[in-house]
A protein has these predicted regions:
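Domain-level signature for soluble enzymes in the chorismate/prephenate branch of the shikimate pathway
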Residues: 1-319
Length: 319
């Protein structure tokens, strides 16, 4: 008798589970359908706005804020975090549509990545670095992708940076990471100070293979033609972003990573460190693998949502 009751109970449980699964699947389908409709509406909204602007970034930003800020301010605070994640996806859909306009996307790319710097004929192909066995190996690897490369030996890391900053050299080489010390923040500070951009990285191993130093090839701007680069070119590169907290309760990292995932960028690495002017706040260095399809949409999102974001590099790993 007990066995039959147990069997009956199990059968009932199985039916309840099956019914619940069916209901959940039905809800998933309805939710997916609603999201698709929502995406279409956001895209239509962005199309209308793009046609009705003067094409300037300031005008677009003003309209963007009027749409999304008002929606967020009305959000029910009890489900604020959930609504924030939805609104981030809405913003990405908006940015995706906006960035499809060549005129608008070119302006946003210039804001985020800067202009191509003019290189004098004397500086063209000239690479400054402090000479030693490791930097010689890095120079040899980097020079394969440089037209008519010429080495220039400097006496200090500061002068290495100044050669590029003043326009005497097109590139310079700096160490940015080691197996012993990790990310070399003193050199990242120099990169910030001289407004340099990482174009390539190369790892030099010690003779016994037990340790390594990662070097960066840096210039005043990103590689020429990156704005119109092919998918093959971009998909082999990473983008490195520096962003800082503005308050203890607010971290930009969550929304940036959500936006990156929505744009199919792959999170490769995240480093954090206390800010020099406030040790209670953190600065983040985020490395993402680029997907060319939504790369412009992601940059557009950063321009709208995180203008304090600084793009340290768009680079390939040289083999």
């Amino acid at each position: 008798m007990r066995k039959s009751i147990a069997i009956h109970t199990n059968d009932s449980l199985d039916r309840d589970v099956a019914t619940s699964k069916t209901n959940i699947n039905d809800l998933d389908k309805k939710q997916h359908s609603l999201f698709e409709i929502r995406n279409v509406l956001v895209s239509e909204l962005s199309d209308v706005i793009c046609k009705d602007t003067d094409g300037s970034f300031d005008d677009l930003l003003s309209r963007y804020e009027s749409i999304f800020d008002s929606a967020e301010n009305q959000a029910d605070k009890s489900i604020e975090k959930y609504l924030d994640s939805l609104s981030t996806l809405d913003k990405i859909n908006f940015c995706r549509a906006v960035s499809s306009s060549k005129r608008i996307s070119q302006e946003i790319l210039k804001i985020m990545l800067g202009e191509d710097e003019k290189i004098s004929p004397d500086a063209k192909g000239r690479v400054a670095y402090m000479k030693n066995h490791y930097t010689d190996a890095a120079y040899l690897a980097f020079s394969k992708a440089i037209s008519s490369p010429r080495s220039y030996y400097s006496t200090s890391f500061q002068s290495v940076c100044e050669e590029v900053y003043t326009g005497a050299c097109e590139y310079c080489i700096l160490p940015i990471e080691s197996s012993l010390d990790g990310k070399l923040m003193s050199f990242y500070s120099m990169i910030d100070k001289y407004e340099l951009k990482i174009n390539s990285v190369y790892v030099v191993k010690s003779a016994d293979g037990q340790s390594f130093t990662k070097f960066a090839l840096l210039g005043k701007s990103f590689s020429s033609g990156i704005f119109n680069a092919s998918s093959v070119y971009l998909n082999k590169r990473n983008i490195e972003i520096r962003v800082s907290q503005t308050s203890i309760s607010d971290s930009p990292l969550d929304s940036i990573l959500l936006a990156a995932r929505a744009c199919s960028l792959r999170t490769q690495r995240i480093d954090s460190l206390p800010l020099s002017y406030n040790e209670n706040l953190l600065g983040y260095y985020v490395v993402l693998g680029i997907n060319h399809v939504d790369f412009k949409a992601f940059l557009t999102y950063l321009a709208f949502e995180h203008p304090q974001c600084y793009i340290v590099g768009i680079y390939s790993n040289v083999n």
